[in-house]
């Protein structure tokens, strides 16, 4: 996009709304967008050829939204997705809801029918601002070209500020076509940003420090907010200085080094037993950047019953929503931790730390790399597969789908850096992994990127294999094929009288499917085959799909039944592990 001023006179030149849109994206530092063209967004696509922004053509708008999501999670920058009106816009809904639940900064730009046709049920007209209002931080309907730049600038500011999230800008076709002279040097208001929380008062920080000094069994719960605020280094320094152990939510994995002596492990419904029991025995809970999701707390009335609770959270709406806390610090987590650290004294927690080590010994192997222990399986065990994958590629970016494999990887893979685990947490969106991995690879082209998906989830957006191949991306895909919707089947087995209604899958030949898309396909049914396949995939310059044929009866343990207490864990029946303390 160029030519905004006359070469001789310097007077501003007219630009179409579509030209303004691309210049806005360039000014925001956007390097890549993901999208799918259609009638109402065609003026924008027509102007795209003059832009430096790269466009990745998805095969479905949901895939494009997940690509933008994966890009944002891997890079920390705002992901951008484009779609046309009507079905193009509605196909974004699942992707926007996924980003909203997990606080991922996205800007979705949709075309809309001409202004004069709004409200007339015109071809491909949908009130997309109305549809997406509950699943975006904010959205805009733009009907004039001069409104585009302020809306886009504000959308980016909103998406990345405070608690991040998706913002949608719906632009009518005539606004894209019409021309205007824009004062680019003028100020564009960002009115919503004045509502951001102020810095936490020092008096409140002093209260928190006093509560920490008074504790004997403190525990830090690290959530996604640690990564979002760039607070991983600050958390490490805080925990080491105070000698406080750390547990992580699913989206908090990687925010604190998994190999660190103070790291307890994954918490919640499928978390390690000692981590959940530690929560129930702690006398102080420091909840950092987490929202007390039901998969983490179990029965809220019995969560951490002996603990004083401090909640550091940027979103005031999350404070007291599920768990009542004794002290809420609303603000940026990194800022809070860095300001508290100079006055932070070590907690006398040697007895507490020794007790936690005893609990680990009571509930499984002392070596964290050997937990969870292998259950009895018929054939290749999925835990063996995931352990092999991580042992061969410990520094990779892992993008997982949703289901049993997602929980096994959280138990097995020892993530030690932020943004190396990308997964759908809050919404639990099957079909997320493959397109999200494409976005992650676009954000981090030098990184090794792996998809881990079940045979059910991989088929929900398998059309994006073609996007992967067309873009020339080296991504490896591990399909954990148990011939069933594994988590559904597990719940049917445990809680619904083993009545397996509609959970069995008839699958395609995944090796042939990969080859049809231009990838290399492999199949593994033994541990030896698995190891050789993973090594071959890593050595291959082309994208590779490996189908791991695993035991269809394997279950994820431990599991806390929905609504039960954290200590009410169900364990693998054949393992001699105590259920509670």
What is each PLM-predicted segment?
Residues 2-12, 146, 307-402, 527-528, ...:
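Phosphate/pyrophosphate-binding active-site segments
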Residues 20-30, 71-76, 100, 158-163, ...:
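Glycine-rich phosphate/diphosphate-binding loops that line cofactor/substrate pockets in enzymes
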Residues 126, 154, 158-214, 365-371, ...:
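Conformationally flexible catalytic loops at phosphate/diphosphate-handling active centers
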